[in-house]
């Protein structure tokens, strides 16, 4: 500032600042002297060609450095880990507005440099006209069954790679003349005595798109919503709505704590308590890791039941299963117990269905 200000006392100010910070002046002079001495030193003449081990060791070091760099960028070396994004800041604060204070400018620029910026959408109707056609807001009348559920516990299951085609109840046409009548016998029996919807529409196609679709009714975009800058915006999600009504909110997933960005988005939507593979292993050890994604669903469902049995009520809990995820393996003791079916996933679906049967029987 003193060099650009329009004044006549710049030299006096410089001398005063130098006197007050004399140790910094000495350090600066010492650095200059060291640079001058080092510059005059004769550099060792490098040989144009070296021995074969020089190049072999150089290639090995380069490959190791590249591998470490990839792991550093991704945040780990497992399939469960994804590179962190803006929404990961919400792991350290429940307030989306404060999350922006945690983020650094260089990181934000790098993560959003390929973003198209503001979302563009077509507006075909004004608000008044649209309200007469369809409104997403529904207000049940007093005395209806919906209002009688106030204060009840809510448990939501998000089942990996499950679809209607696995169920003989939902898609009986697929099993006409087939010896195997579906792969979800327990869930079918549950749906027969439950309030079941037969019309289902996908709001996401990949695991990473599931939570915004299910909790917040946010559809899929070209990029998963949790990886977009807009993910830090306020959303009226189901966990936040129930939290404001006095519910304890929890999210269970047997994968690693930072897997797929689930934990970050869960925090952002009002989830207070996260339970992951690390939490399970603190209680039950690491023997139930499936070797790929996390804890087997049967074991983790039982763990969730243990936690919920001690939980303050009312509570809202979500469980995201993973055993039916690729590469479609089941615990060794269950190999061959469930129908192999026509796809590699069918045996896993049967295994998870049985895990739900045991969970409902015990908890």
Show the residue positions of the predicted features.
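Soluble catalytic regions of membrane-associated enzymes that act on cell-envelope
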Residues: 75-363
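Internal/C-terminal transmembrane anchor helices
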Residues: 51-78
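Generic secondary-structure transition motif, activating predominantly at the C-termini of alpha-helices
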Residues: 3-7, 14-22, 42, 49, ...
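Hydrophobic alpha-helical transmembrane segments
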Residues: 15-17, 38, 68-72
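Membrane-interfacial interhelical loops
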Residues: 1-27, 45-49, 74-105
């Amino acid at each position: 500032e003193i060099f650009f200000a329009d004044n006549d006392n710049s030299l006096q100010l410089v001398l005063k600042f130098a006197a007050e910070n004399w140790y910094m002046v000495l350090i600066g002079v010492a650095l200059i002297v060291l640079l001058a001495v080092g510059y005059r030193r004769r550099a060792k003449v490098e040989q144009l060609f070296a021995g074969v081990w020089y190049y072999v060791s150089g290639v090995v070091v380069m490959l190791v450095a590249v591998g470490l760099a990839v792991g550093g960028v991704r945040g780990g070396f497992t399939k469960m880990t994804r590179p962190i994004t803006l929404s990961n800041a919400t792991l350290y604060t429940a307030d989306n507005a404060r999350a922006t204070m945690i983020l650094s400018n260089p990181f934000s620029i790098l993560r959003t440099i390929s973003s198209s910026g503001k979302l563009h959408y077509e507006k075909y109707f004004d608000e008044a006209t649209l309200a007469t056609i369809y409104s997403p807001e529904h207000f049940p009348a007093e005395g209806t069954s919906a209002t009688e559920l106030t204060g009840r516990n809510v448990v939501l299951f998000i089942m990996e790679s499950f679809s209607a085609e696995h169920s003989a109840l939902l898609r009986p046409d697929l099993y006409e003349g087939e010896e195997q009548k579906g792969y979800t016998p327990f869930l079918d029996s549950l749906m027969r005595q439950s309030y079941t919807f037969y019309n289902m529409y996908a709001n996401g196609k990949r695991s990473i798109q599931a939570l915004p679709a299910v909790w917040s009714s946010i559809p899929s975009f070209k990029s998963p919503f949790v990886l977009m800058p807009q993910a830090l915006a306020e959303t009226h999600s189901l966990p936040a709505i129930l939290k404001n009504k006095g519910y304890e909110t929890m999210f269970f997933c047997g994968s690693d704590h930072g897997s797929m960005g689930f934990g970050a988005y869960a925090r952002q939507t009002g989830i207070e308590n996260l339970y992951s593979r690390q939490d399970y292993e603190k209680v039950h050890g690491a023997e139930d890791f499936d070797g790929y994604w996390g804890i087997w669903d049967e074991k983790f469902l039982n763990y969730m039941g243990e936690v919920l049995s001690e939980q303050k009520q009312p509570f809202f809990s979500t469980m995201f299963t993973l055993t039916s995820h690729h590469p479609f393996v089941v615990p060794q003791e269950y190999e061959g117990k469930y129908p192999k079916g026509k796809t590699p996933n069918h045996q896993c679906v049967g295994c998870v269905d049985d895990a739900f049967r045991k969970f409902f029987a015990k908890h």
